[in-house]
């Protein structure tokens, strides 16, 4: 479905997890935050975690735990700290001279991320944010925000979006759209000197997997991070669907008076080879790494369903690295939810009974799909492409039904 996007904005300001949770906790007086400190490792007595070694302003410190240690360093650094502490693949630890506390092969594996790219159109009507790009306009927006915390400075402008299924046989949406009323890249450059708009679109369940590994045992050294983006063939099919479905949206009758020429990838990027080249050049990270300390019930999983690190005692991980599969939406909200749930587990809070109300699923998810056929090769077949776009431009989505298209009849 499509609708307004949720934002973490409070009183006109971006609201971080630190602002919502950490600063109020510090104000209570029972939390001490040491900024500019660098954690080296967790110290064990046998397999019991009992202390943390860290440096602050060039001095090494050790702080002992009364009950347990909770590691919240994120999907890149949590597995790195575990490995420096002796928890990880035995061969990798031995290669860096680190004594093995627990041989856990999956620490640092299963690295996932969300990728996206954007399609841009010129806009036929003067309704985009293009006039705000001048210095005077930016100054006025900034002044309004400083005085009132309202206006264009109080939003990220991705105010609408959607989630769809890329093809039949997928139960839940696997493609996400973010719409922006401006044609611009993240570096501030624009393909047009005028009004435009764009959609940021990407897959949410990539099958590609990467890893995080040690460069050495020095806590100041950066780790080796390899995402292995687009290494699974299904990722290419799904991103072709992203582009096709975005074009379908921009060819809807409701946008006929607004959608001008396609700026990116461009109207002549149709062949699969050309589309793949565009994907390769333009796809980029949404900065949602997760999965490297995978939670699960299997013995091979890094953490158990209580977020406890397997093979040792007194150590938990609480961050997005726990996710066994990337969520089908952005990670900020799910990560906060995960942390709240783990907080209840750590405190031993008795939770209410689970609400097992059935999730809404399209009744014909096995058969229904958009008219774009992911198995069809569009190389040298622009007639089929035009027929597909034309058909979808003539058919509005109604009652949750998706129109079918048999290319053999066009």
Model-identified regions with their sequence ranges:
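Active-site acidic short loop of glycosyltransferases
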Residues: 28, 65-67, 312
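FAD-dependent oxidoreductase catalytic-site/capping-region signature
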Residues: 3-5, 124-127, 141-334, 342-407
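General small-molecule cofactor/ligand-binding pocket signal
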Residues: 32-34, 101-103, 178
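Glycine-rich loop(s) and the adjacent beta-strand/alpha-helix scaffold that form part
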Residues: 42, 51-142, 151-152, 217, ...
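Conserved redox-cofactor binding core of oxidoreductases
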Residues: 1-49, 55-57, 118-142
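Short glycine-/acidic-enriched loop or helix-start segments at secondary-structure transitions
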Residues: 44, 80-82, 189, 327
């Amino acid at each position: 479905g499509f609708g307004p996007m949720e934002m973490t904005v409070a009183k006109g300001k971006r609201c971080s997890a630190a602002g919502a949770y950490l600063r109020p906790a510090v104000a209570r007086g029972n939390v001490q935050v040491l900024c500019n400190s660098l954690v080296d490792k967790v110290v064990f007595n046998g397999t019991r975690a009992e202390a943390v070694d860290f440096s602050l302003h060039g001095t090494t410190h050790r702080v002992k735990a009364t009950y347990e240690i909770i590691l919240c360093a994120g999907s890149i650094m949590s597995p790195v700290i575990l490995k420096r502490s002796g928890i990880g693949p035995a061969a990798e630890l031995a290669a860096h001279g680190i004594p093995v506390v627990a041989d856990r092969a999956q620490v640092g594996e299963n690295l996932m991320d969300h990728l996206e790219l954007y399609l841009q159109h010129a806009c036929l009507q003067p309704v985009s944010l293009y006039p705000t790009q001048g210095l005077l306009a930016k100054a006025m927006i900034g002044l309004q925000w400083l005085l009132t915390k309202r206006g264009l400075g109080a939003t990220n402008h991705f105010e609408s979006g959607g989630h769809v299924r890329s093809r039949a046989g997928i139960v839940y949406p696997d493609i996400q759209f973010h719409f922006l009323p401006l044609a611009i890249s993240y570096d501030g450059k624009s393909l047009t000197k005028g009004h435009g708009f764009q959609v940021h679109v990407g897959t949410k369940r990539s099958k590609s997997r990467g890893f995080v590994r040690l460069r050495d045992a020095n806590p100041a050294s950066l780790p080796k991070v390899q995402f292995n983006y687009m290494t699974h063939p299904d990722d290419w099919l799904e991103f072709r669907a992203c582009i096709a479905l975005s074009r379908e949206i921009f060819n809807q009758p409701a946008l006929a008076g607004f959608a001008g020429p396609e700026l990116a990838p461009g109207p002549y990027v149709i062949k699969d080879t050309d589309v793949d080249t565009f994907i390769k050049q333009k796809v980029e990270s949404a900065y949602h790494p997760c999965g490297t300390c995978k939670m699960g019930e299997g013995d091979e999983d890094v953490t158990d369903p209580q977020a406890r690190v397997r093979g040792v005692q007194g150590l938990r991980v609480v961050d997005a690295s726990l996710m066994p599969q990337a969520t089908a939406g952005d990670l900020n909200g799910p990560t906060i939810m995960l942390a709240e749930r783990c907080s209840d587990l750590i405190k031993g809070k008795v939770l209410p009974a689970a609400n097992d109300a059935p999730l809404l699923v399209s009744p014909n998810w096995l058969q229904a799909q958009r008219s774009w056929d992911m198995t069809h090769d569009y190389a040298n077949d622009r007639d089929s492409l035009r027929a597909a776009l034309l058909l979808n431009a003539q058919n509005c989505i109604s009652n949750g039904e998706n129109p079918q298209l048999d290319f053999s009849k066009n």
